[in-house]
UniProtKB/Swiss-Prot annotation:
Residues 142-169, 249-273 form a coiled coil. Keywords: ANK repeat, Coiled coil, Cytoplasm, Metal-binding, Repeat, Zinc, Zinc-finger. One of its GO terms (molecular function) is GTPase activator activity. One of its GO terms (cellular component) is focal adhesion. The gene is Asap3. It comes from the Eukaryota. ANK repeats lie at residues 584-616, 620-649. Residues 794-806 have a biased composition (Low complexity). PROSITE patterns: ANK_REP_REGION, ANK_REPEAT, ARFGAP, PH_DOMAIN. SUPFAM superfamilies: Ankyrin repeat, ArfGap/RecO-like zinc finger, BAR/IMD domain-like, PH domain-like. Residues 425-550 form the Arf-GAP domain. This is Arf-GAP with SH3 domain, ANK repeat and PH domain-containing protein 3. Promotes cell proliferation. It is found in: Cytoplasm.
């Protein structure tokens, strides 16, 4: 594009062309620049027109929304004014005055804003409208068209003259002759150029200075708006300052009233709760006390059902398999196709029943680890199963809330499923029987059922809520009745308890004016006390944290001293001093694992759950998991894995705990770590700990006994309870206790399993043998005899039907000190002592019986003389103590002389 020509240059060139013929040539040369200037100016004007159109739309939107804002603000003012009048009618003069004055201020500001919006419309919007409409009527486009036509005429004339000159064969013409011939065309072009520049100039004035002047006027309107609004706000500012102070006082007064009302409400709720429990004691099994927002079953189907369902397999093929199912005592049992496999037992409290809306004959049972898909014969059968499952679940839930055990719940089904539950139930009962555990650890409420697993204390439901607010860093709350606890989670509760815990944590509790809440205290006082006790350790037995004392407590297995160190703020992540005051050696948890035994497992558990730093490394880079694998501490390893210790951590040598277990050939630790690393570790884990309880399992039939004996999948009862320090002999022939460690022996044909219990009222009696002649006075004798047996001994019928043994009362005597003193005895087996007047020849080894012989003396019908044992030389047939070996060979019982042992 040629260079543009300004208006001043156009005026100068045109004046020169008009004044002298010489200027014609100069103007002719600049005519293209004149045309380019006109085109550029037109393009700029068109761009400005588009921008002004956008401004016009924005101004209209502001005006419209401004009017809407003014209207909405007027509604707001009316509402505030109505609120002020309402408070005025309630004699709340301070509040009403504030609302009314702010309503007046809102009205003033709204009026100012409305005026501003109107000024925007008048000052800006109207000029824009006239400008846009004048753009269509100013004739600028016509002038531009005429200019273009004049330019074309001029070019046509010049081209025509050049052709004529070429036709006349003139080598060239002078510029003067050419200028004279095109003079008219130049004048027409100059005229239209002037007209266009005039029209374009007028448009530029309107779009530029005139519109800017309008914006300046609107600026003054805005300035006045803000100035008037500032004046209105300044006039109201002193009143607002006074109002803020009075409102603060009113708020404090109302908060005090609300606090008192809240306390009254809590006390009334507690009273109503107690009354409801007293007035409705028989609503235990109704299920109406708890509304579960799930599918509700039809109550007419009951809570028990046995039948067949089709279950979709969980394998690759996923086929429907017919399985016998039963619902009873809040559990669903699913039998396998193989009879010798125990059925699957699912507690319904942790399941959810979901009917299939698409297929009416199907329903799902969602458990914690998988979803079971069931298919019934028809829709009615499906509805019955769903209703029974939901009803049984509701019944179990209601029983759990009312503290009732599910009758027969753990006795129905297979022994394999019931043993962990039996152990947990016994341990829970033992925890509740510990000193102080019959009352809440914090408020003293009766029958607490909520356990802090990391502290080993029992609390009521109100205090447990505050414990949950503290977080798991301070207290990990679980229910003894609602949650499925494992034995390891009761470890600290069995070894600490409320009494011992409060001896440390409430040692400095004031006796007068004590802040300790009661069972009737509100939640605020409970919260303040529990925070002071568990977070601040305000009432604990204070002493200076001493790492040496902590080391001594761990080595001496003193759990309460470790608890006292915890109360004093001892950092368990601090390196403990070495023995005899040497340089710092290892961490507290590492030391506890290294010296761990059955008696010190509670200390390890306490350190793990209360800041034991599971990922902390010792000087050699080993974590606590490495240390447990290094020393083969299987139970410590289980506690660490339960506490989510990092399995993949490596030490300075680049070894994981699994590598160490493999190198040390600790097979059990290796298997456990492999399961943890693969993510297949199942909780809870069995702990080989001296729980202090023993169990004797009976059998309902001989077939069940044989199955238990030969089934490799079922661990023997003694293997599960091998850590119990008190051996209990066969309860059929009175209970005889033998001290010493229990030995685990395999079941064999020569050692039948224990016999069923026939008299549960008999208790353990520890006796001491009387001194007798010879060198047999040091043999232990543990015998007991019920009064009924003594009374009925003279009766022939009683001698043939009842099974008794005579044991003299007394304590335990010491074992033989040398082999020359008597017969050799195996570990954990004590033999009967000599009665007064019995010679050494009358003492015999315990007799082992095969399973066939055991059944023989049950049936009866053969005499003792037919057996091989009867052919042994006996001095006397009466009052001879005979030993009976238990099923695993580790326990014996003493049989009465009246018992006729029949042997094939």
């Amino acid at each position: 594009m040629p260079e543009q020509l300004s208006v001043a240059e156009f005026l100068a060139v045109t004046a020169e062309d008009l004044s002298s013929p010489a200027g014609a040539a100069a103007f002719a040369a600049k005519m293209p620049r004149c045309r380019g200037a006109a085109l550029a100016r037109e393009e700029a004007l068109e761009g400005d027109q588009a921008i002004l159109q956008r401004i016009k739309k924005a101004v209209r939107a502001i005006h419209s929304s401004g009017l809407g804002h003014v209207e909405t603000e007027e509604h707001y003012r009316e509402a505030v004014e109505a609120l002020g009048n309402s408070h005025l009618s309630q004699n709340s003069h301070e509040l009403s005055t504030g609302f009314l004055n702010l309503a007046v201020f809102t009205r003033e500001v709204a009026a100012l804003f409305k005026n501003l919006v109107q000024n925007l419309n008048n000052i800006v919007s109207f000029p824009l409208d006239s400008l846009m409409k004048g753009h269509l009527r100013d004739g600028r486009h016509d002038s531009k068209k005429h200019l273009e036509k004049a330019w074309k005429d001029y070019e046509s004339k010049v081209a025509k003259l050049e052709k004529e000159r070429d036709r006349a064969r003139f080598p060239g013409g002078s510029h003067g002759v050419m200028s004279q011939d095109t003079q008219r065309e130049r004048r027409v072009f100059q005229l239209h150029m002037c007209e266009y520049l005039v029209k374009a100039g007028e448009s530029q004035v309107k779009q530029g200075p005139d519109f800017l002047q309008s914006l300046i006027k609107f600026f003054h309107a805005q300035h006045n708006f803000f100035q008037d609004g500032w004046k209105a706000a300044q006039s109201l500012s002193p009143f607002i300052d006074k109002l803020a102070a009075s409102v603060h006082g009113l708020r404090q007064a109302q908060e005090e009233e609300l606090h008192k009302l809240t306390q009254l409400r809590d006390s009334l709720r507690g009273m109503l709760h107690l009354e409801s429990r007293e007035d409705h004691p028989n609503r235990k099994n109704s299920g109406g006390g708890y509304s579960i927002h799930q599918h509700q079953g039809n109550k007419q189907f009951g809570t028990e059902k046995v039948g067949f369902l089709y279950k979709k397999s969980d394998g690759i093929r996923r086929v429907w398999q017919k399985r016998k199912c039963g619902v009873k005592y809040g559990c669903l049992t699913i039998s396998h196709s193989m009879i010798n496999r125990p059925p699957v037992k699912l507690p319904l409290l942790t399941c959810q029943v979901r009917p299939n809306p698409e297929e009416k004959r199907c329903f799902d049972l969602v458990t914690h680890n998988r979803t079971y898909h069931f298919h019934a014969e028809d829709e009615q059968e499906c509805e019955a199963w769903v209703s029974v499952l939901q009803n049984s679940k509701d019944e179990a839930l209601s029983n759990a809330f009312h503290g009732e055990p599910s009758g027969g719940q753990w006795s129905w089904g297979t022994r394999l499923d019931t043993e962990p539950h039996d152990l947990t139930n016994m341990l829970v009962a033992e925890v509740k029987s510990r000193p102080g555990n019959d009352r809440c650890c914090d408020c003293g409420a009766a029958d607490p059922t909520w356990l802090s697993t990391n502290l080993g204390v029992l609390t009521c439901i109100q205090c447990s809520g505050v414990h949950r607010e503290l977080g798991v860093r301070f207290s990990r709350i679980q229910s003894l009745t609602l949650d499925l606890l494992g034995p390891s989670e009761l470890l600290l509760a069995l070894n600490i308890g409320n009494s011992h815990f409060n001896e440390v944590m409430e040692a400095h509790l004031p006796s007068h004016g004590s802040p300790k809440p009661s069972a009737e205290s509100d939640m605020s006082s409970r919260r303040n006390y529990i925070v002071a006790k568990y977070v601040e350790h305000k009432f604990a037995r204070h002493s200076t944290p001493d790492p040496q004392k902590l080391r001594t407590a761990i080595c001496s297995r003193d759990l309460l001293s470790v608890l006292e160190a915890f109360a004093n703020g001892q950092d368990f992540g601090q390196l403990l001093p070495g023995p005899d005051g040497q340089a710092p050696g290892e961490l507290a948890l590492h030391l506890a694992i290294r010296v761990a035994s059955h008696a010190s497992l509670p200390i390890v558990d306490f350190l793990i759950q209360n800041g034991g730093h599971l990922d902390a490394k010792a000087a050699d880079g080993n974590t606590a998991l490495h240390c447990a694998a290094l020393h083969g501490q299987l139970d410590c390893l289980k506690l660490l894995l339960r506490g989510r210790a990092p399995v993949g951590a490596v030490n300075d040598a680049g070894e994981t705990a699994l590598d160490i277990a493999r190198n040390r050939q600790h097979k059990e630790c290796e298997e456990l770590l492999e399961q943890a690393q693969a993510g297949t570790l199942a909780f809870p884990l069995h702990m080989d700990y001296h729980w202090g309880h023993s169990m004797e399992h009976g059998f309902d039939s001989e077939e069940e006994e044989e199955e238990e004996k030969h089934c490799p999948s079922k661990p023997p009862a003694q293997a599960c309870w091998g850590s119990v320090r008190l051996d209990i002999s066969n309860k059929t022939y009175e209970t005889v206790a033998t001290p010493g460690p229990a030995t685990t022996q395999s079941q064999s044909e020569d050692s039948p399993p224990p016999l069923p219990i026939k008299n549960s009222s008999r208790t353990i009696v520890l006796g001491r043998a009387g001194h007798c002649s010879g060198d047999r006075s040091d043999l232990p004798s543990l015998r007991s005899e019920s009064p009924e047996a003594l009374e009925n001994r003279s009766s022939p019928a009683s001698s043939s039907s009842s099974l008794t043994s005579s044991v003299e009362p007394g304590g335990l005597s010491q074992a033989p000190s040398s082999p020359e003193e008597g017969l050799q005895e195996s570990a954990s087996i004590s033999r009967p002592g000599l009665a007064s007047g019995t010679t050494s020849a009358e003492v015999y080894l315990p007799v082992k019986f095969s399973s066939e012989s055991t059944r023989s003396y049950r049936r009866g019908g053969r005499s003792l003389e037919d057996s091989p044992s009867a052919r042994q030389p006996l001095c006397s047939r009466r009052h001879i103590p005979v030993g009976l070996v238990e099923g695993d060979g580790s326990k014996i019982g003493v049989l009465p002389d009246s018992l006729q042992l029949l042997h094939d």
